[in-house]
UniProtKB/Swiss-Prot annotation:
UniProt-recorded Gene Ontology molecular function terms: microtubule binding
Source species of the chain: Bos taurus
The protein's name: Centrosomal protein of 44 kDa
The keyword Phosphoprotein appears for this protein: yes
Pfam family, one: CEP44
Taxonomy of the source species: Eukaryota, Metazoa, Chordata, Craniata, Vertebrata
Location of this chain's protein in the cell: Cytoplasm, Cytoskeleton, Microtubule organizing center, Centrosome; Cytoplasm, Cytoskeleton, Microtubule organizing center, Centrosome, Centriole; Cytoplasm, Cytoskeleton, Spindle pole; Midbody
Function summary: Centriole-enriched microtubule-binding protein involved in centriole biogenesis. In collaboration with CEP295 and POC1B, is required for the centriole-to-centrosome conversion by ensuring the formation of bona fide centriole wall. Functions as a linker component that maintains centrosome cohesion. Associates with CROCC and regulates its stability and localization to the centrosome.
InterPro entries: CEP44, CEP44_CC
Subunit and interaction comment: Interacts with CROCC. Interacts with POC1B; the interaction is direct and recruits POC1B to centriolar microtubules. Binds to centriolar microtubules.
Annotated Low complexity bias: 305-314, 332-342
Coiled coil: 230-271, 358-381
Cellular component aspect of the GO annotation: centriole; centrosome; cytoplasm; midbody; spindle pole
Region (Binds with microtubules and centrioles): 11-192
């Protein structure tokens, strides 16, 4: 994009803003960069604050431009330009919001300002026509009254013959009447006619003063129109406040329902809950391991008892020989006693079987303990725990 085109478009914008009487400072750097923040204040001023007629048109068409973000503002402006001004911008909404397209954006701003000034002239001319008609009617009423006033203000004289004579080019109506020789007495009929003419003039003069009294009313209406944009802004703010209050009531009702649902419940953080679960699992494993250790200790004690008893039997051979002798001697009753060798043999056999069973159970217990230790190690390795 050439710099000359940008300078030309900026000059055009300055001229339009001068004709618009724009009171604020213009961000020329932002306009050259194509920043939307530099162009939006100009558009909002032209549509809301420049012309009371345009502001009234916005109110009649239920268009709100105040208290909106950039996207909604541009959306409403594009709709307003399409519906009320019959203007379609060159750029789309997305392109206008994006940074860039500086020359096109300046051209669109100039077009919008020209459209607003044109609409202002149209609406002001429409309001001027009824006021001009009122002035014409008032002037038409004042003309006959002024003519009657001129006729009445002219000096009237009474001729010797009893005629009313006015000084001037215009001749007054001559009223003939009879009079006595004693004095020229004017009859009552002529006096009443003249009084009626003056009364008519007074009525017309009063009618002329009525439109003069209506002029300050028109000025008051214009002042009301200038105040209307501020009133519309306040109305829009009130509407937004009402919407926010409705949302607050909805949020309060939801909070109350949540409080009723969450009565009697305890909220725990995920990390703390995971830590608690890991601790519980560790405690369970400790309990199991302690039980296994107790069982293993009891089993060792039992095996030690069995081994000590077997050693004691081996240390007493004399006792065994005596028992064998007693077994070889037949009893007098005829019954044969069971040999004493059977008891230690059976005890040794039972001891061997118990030893094998105990070894198997210990191996199984050790494997289970290994599995438990591995599971606890995996649980402790997890980062959440």
């Amino acid at each position: 994009m050439a710099t000359g085109d940008l300078k030309r478009s900026l000059r055009n914008l300055e001229q339009v803003l001068r004709s618009l009487n724009y009171p604020r400072e213009v961000d020329c750097v932002g306009l050259v960069k194509g920043d939307t923040a530099a162009s939006l204040p100009i558009i909002s001023y032209s549509l809301t604050s420049y012309s009371p007629y345009v502001a009234e048109l916005l109110v009649d068409s239920n268009i709100e431009l105040l208290a909106k973000n950039d996207l909604r503002f541009i959306d409403t402006v594009y709709k307003l330009l399409r519906d009320q001004f019959n203007y379609k911008p060159i750029l789309t909404k997305k392109q206008f919001i994006q940074c860039g397209f500086a020359e096109w954006k300046i051209q669109i701003i100039c077009d919008i300002l020209n459209c607003v000034m044109k609409k202002h002239k149209e609406l002001s001319s429409l309001e001027k026509t009824p006021s001009q008609q009122r002035k014409k009617t008032s002037s038409a009423k004042s003309e006959p009254c002024s003519s009657t006033e001129k006729t009445s203000t002219e000096p009237v004289g009474i001729d010797v013959t009893g005629r009313f004579v006015t000084s001037g080019k215009k001749k007054a109506v001559v009223i003939r009447h009879l009079y006595n020789e004693d004095g020229a007495n004017i009859p009552e009929d002529t006096v009443t006619d003249v009084n009626e003419a003056f009364d008519v003039c007074d009525i017309k003069a009063a009618e002329i003063t009525i439109p003069e009294l209506q002029v300050p009313d028109i000025n008051c209406e214009q002042e009301d129109i200038t105040v209307n944009p501020e009133v519309t802004a306040l109305q829009s703010m009130l509407a937004e406040c009402q919407e926010k209050l409705k949302k607050l009531t909805c949020i309060e009702s939801r909070l109350e329902s949540l409080e009723e649902k969450m009565k009697g419940k305890v909220l725990v953080n995920e990390k703390t809950w995971a830590n608690l679960l890991s601790r519980v699992t560790l405690l369970e494993t400790e309990m199991l391991l302690s039980k296994k250790n107790d069982e293993y200790m009891q089993f060792n004690e039992m095996s030690e008892d069995y081994s000590s008893s077997s050693d004691m039997d081996s240390l007493n051979p004399d006792r065994k020989s005596k028992e064998e002798r007693h077994a070889n001697i037949p009893l007098s009753s005829g019954y044969s006693t069971v040999s004493s060798d059977s008891t230690p043999r059976t005890s040794t056999v039972n001891y061997c079987g118990l030893k094998e069973i105990s070894e198997e159970t210990t191996m199984q217990k050790m494997e289970r303990m290994k599995k438990m230790f591995e599971e606890t190690a995996e649980l402790l390795k997890c980062p959440n725990h």
